[in-house]
From Swiss-Prot:
It is a single-pass membrane protein. The lineage of its organism: Bacteria, Bacillati, Actinomycetota, Actinomycetes, Mycobacteriales. F(1)F(0) ATP synthase produces ATP from ADP in the presence of a proton or sodium gradient. F-type ATPases consist of two structural domains, F(1) containing the extramembraneous catalytic core and F(0) containing the membrane proton channel, linked together by a central stalk and a peripheral stalk. During catalysis, ATP synthesis in the catalytic domain of F(1) is coupled via a rotary mechanism of the central stalk subunits to proton translocation. CDD domains: ATP-synt_Fo_b. The chain crosses the membrane at residues 26-46. PANTHER family: ATP SYNTHASE SUBUNIT B, ATP SYNTHASE SUBUNIT B', CHLOROPLASTIC. Belongs to the ATPase B chain family. This is ATP synthase subunit b. GO terms for cellular component: plasma membrane; proton-transporting ATP synthase complex. HAMAP family: ATP_synth_b_bprime. Keywords: ATP synthesis, Cell membrane, CF(0), Hydrogen ion transport, Ion transport, Membrane, Transmembrane, Transmembrane helix, Transport.
Length: 169
């Protein structure tokens, strides 16, 4: 019977309960865990949640602002392209108008220069014609004297006195 009593003693020392059934330590640890969980839920989670919500709101607002800015940029770019196209058309019209006016001025100056040149040419022709007639008249009047002088030199006789007496008759 000695063997049986050692077996019973060994069974009593090794713990007599089922390990699946909780004992008092488990309930104490569970109570501490629930208290810590309550403290975290009451004082730690709300500020973190608030910061996360503010951050999410800020990100949402930033995305919305970026979308609005992109829309405004696209609208401004479209407007600027329209304004630039209008300005280019106006500049092209002004250039064409200036070219037309330049051509008119150039043709006007050419016609003035041509008229002035024609007037100067006519004036010069008239002056040359008058000078030619005057020179011809001078030569006509001096031809008689020159021919008498030349004849007297060639013949050696003074013809100017003979010519004067023959004209006087």
């Amino acid at each position: 019977m000695g063997d049986l009593s050692t077996t019973i003693l060994a069974a009593e020392e090794g713990g007599g309960g089922n390990f699946l059934v909780p004992n008092g330590t488990f309930f104490f640890v569970l109570l501490i865990f629930l208290i810590v969980l309550g403290v975290i839920a009451k004082w730690v989670v709300p500020p973190i949640s608030k910061v996360l919500q503010e951050r999410e709101a800020m990100v949402t607002k930033t995305v919305e602002d970026n979308r609005k800015a992109a829309d405004l940029f696209a609208a401004a770019q479209g407007d600027s392209q329209q304004v630039m196209a209008k300005a280019r058309r106006e500049a092209s019209g002004i250039r064409d108008e200036a070219r037309g006016e330049g051509r008119k001025i150039l043709e006007d100056m050419r016609s003035r220069a041509s008229a002035e040149s024609a007037a100067t040419l006519q004036k010069t022709n008239e002056e040359l014609s008058r000078q030619g007639q005057q020179t011809a008249a001078e030569l006509q009047s001096s031809i008689e004297t020159l021919s008498a002088t030349l004849a007297s030199r060639v013949l050696g006789v003074d013809i100017s006195s003979a010519a004067a007496t023959s004209q006087g008759r």
